Amino acid sequence: MKMASNDANPSDGSAANLVPEVNNEVMALEPVVGAAIAAPVAGQQNVIDPWIRNNFVQAPGGEFTVSPRNAPGEILWSAPLGPDLNPYLSHLSRMYNGYAGGFEVQVILAGNAFTAGKVIFAAVPPNFPTEGLSPSQVTMFPHIIVDVRQLEPVLIPLPDVRNNFYHYNQANDSTLKLIAMLYTPLRANNAGDDVFTVSCRVLTRPSPDFDFIFLVPPTVESRTKPFTVPVLTVEEMSNSRFPIPLEKLYTGPSSAFVVQPQNGRCTTDGVLLGTTQLSAVNICNFRGDVTHIAGSHDYTMNLASQNWSNYDPTEEIPAPLGTPDFVGKIQGLLTQTTRADGSTRAHKATVSTGSVHFTPKLGSVQFTTDTNNDFQAGQNTKFTPVGVIQDGDHHQNEPQQWSLPNYSGRTGHNVHLAPAVAPTFPGEQLLFFRSTMPGCSGYPNMNLDCLLPQEWVLHFYQEAAPAQSDVALLRFVNPDTGRVLFECKLHKSGYITVAHTGPYDLVLPPNGYFRFDSWVNQFYTLAPMGNGTGRRRAL
C-alpha cells in the first residue's frame, strides 16, 4: 500500500488519513519588483547560470530537528533573505557589489504516519524583532503551517521586501527573515520514554527576479579552509590539562554541569584561551630560577616564560601558559643545569596549587623538595610533573579538578580567565575526555577530564578554519565496523555536548574517532545516546 498516493482508494478503517494530503496552502505574500527596477539606476545587470535558477539546493545550516523536548513557540531555525541563503549565490556574491530579488524556498520534512505535531513557517518583515514571539503572534505574519507527517515538499516564496532599489553585499541591511517555529508539540502514539526526532531540510533557489549588480574587480583569491577534526582515535590522543594519554570518553549526571578549565581551551577557529599553549610536554611545567627558604626544604621559583625569557605579570593571561588549572598537590622532578660547567642535578619536588604561596600570575611558586642545599640560585631550573598526591584521612578529596587555583594568591582575583562552559540546550550534557593521573602518594582522585584533546587544540590553531555556524555536528565512528555510535555538538567556543538524560553515567571506549558531518544551528536536536533509536532523516 502506498500511504500518500493520490489515486489510492479511500479507506474506511481506523487508519484512514494517517498522512495528510499535499499541502496546497499558499503563503500570503504577493510578488514584488525585483532586480528589474534596480537595473535603470544601477547601470548594469548580471546573468546567473540557469542551472542555479532551476534547482533547489540545501541552504547552509539548512537542517534542523524537532523532538518532544522542543516547546511550542521555540524558534527551530531562522535565516534572513540574502545571497548566503544559497551556497551558489553566496559564492557568486564575492564577485558583485549588490543584489536585488527574492528566493523560493522548499521545505522537506521526514514525515511518517506515527508522529503528530505542526511547524509554522513565517516571513517576518525587515527590522522586526523575532525574540519573544508566541505561536499566536507568528500567525499574524504571512505564514504556512506544516504537519510533520507531510511527505511532499512545501514551497514558500520569499520576496525581497526593501525600501531601496538594491542591497549592497557589504552592507548589513535588514531583510525579510524566514523563521520556523514549533506550533504544536511533537508526540507519538507509543507509551515508551524513548526520545525521537524528526529532521527537516530547507532548500533554496533564486526567484526569476533575482540578479546581481555591479561586477567588482577581482582580487587575490583567498581560499576558505574547510573545517576538519583530526582523524585520531581517542586512545591515540593526549590530555590537554596534564601530560598523560586519554583513556575514555565520559558523560553523565555525576559529572560537573558548569566547568571552567584554563588549559585545553581553544575555539574551533583557532583562538587559544586561558593558559592554553600548543606543546603537550609543557603542560603543568614551571621554569625559572630558585631561591632557598632558610631552615626548610622549600624553594621559591621566580618564573620565566617557556622560552626562558622574562615573564611579564601584566600580560593579559590568567597565569604563565601551561600553569595547572586545578587545586591539588602535584609531585614531580625539579631539575637544574649549571651554566658555567654544565653540571646537572634533580630532586623530587611537590607544588601545592591551593597554597597561599602559589602565585604564578605574580611570577612565583613554592616547591617542597627533599634537599636543602643542592640547588643553586640564579640557574635554569625546571619542574616536570609526574603525578598527584593526597594527604589526610578523607580519601580522594584531592585533587579537585574543577576548582580553579588562586593564580594571584588568596588576596588577589583571577583575571583574563577563559569563560565557563555549560550545555545550552535541554537534554544535553558535556562530553569529557578522561585520563587517569599517576598517583604518587595517599589516595588521590586520579580522574582528570578535559574539554578538548591537546591534538585538537593544535589542529584548530594550525588550520584556523572559519566557523560557518555556532555548532559543528560530529559523529563518533567505530573504525573497525564503520558504524556511527553517537552524534554530538562541537560548540564554537570549544566544548562538546551529547544528548543524555539518563540517571546513569556513560563511559565510552577509546577506540573510535570523531568525524565532522556538517554545520548546524544551536537548536539542532541530537539523537539520544545509550539507546537503539535512530533518527528519521529527510532524504
From Swiss-Prot:
Location of the region described as Protruding domain in the Swiss-Prot/TrEMBL record: 222-539
Stored SUPFAM superfamilies: Positive stranded ssRNA viruses
Positions of the UniProt region annotated as P1 sub-domain 2: 418-539
InterPro entries: Calicivirus_coat, Calicivirus_coat_C, Rhv-like, Viral_coat
Gene3D superfamilies membership: 2.60.120.20, Positive stranded ssRNA viruses
Site (Cleavage): 223-224
UniProt entry keywords in alphabetical sequence: Capsid protein, Host cytoplasm, T=3 icosahedral capsid protein, Virion
Region (P1 sub-domain 1): 222-274
Family: Belongs to the caliciviridae capsid protein family.
Protein name: Capsid protein VP1
Organism: Lordsdale virus (strain GII/Human/United Kingdom/Lordsdale/1993)
UniProt lineage: Viruses, Riboviria, Orthornavirae, Pisuviricota, Pisoniviricetes
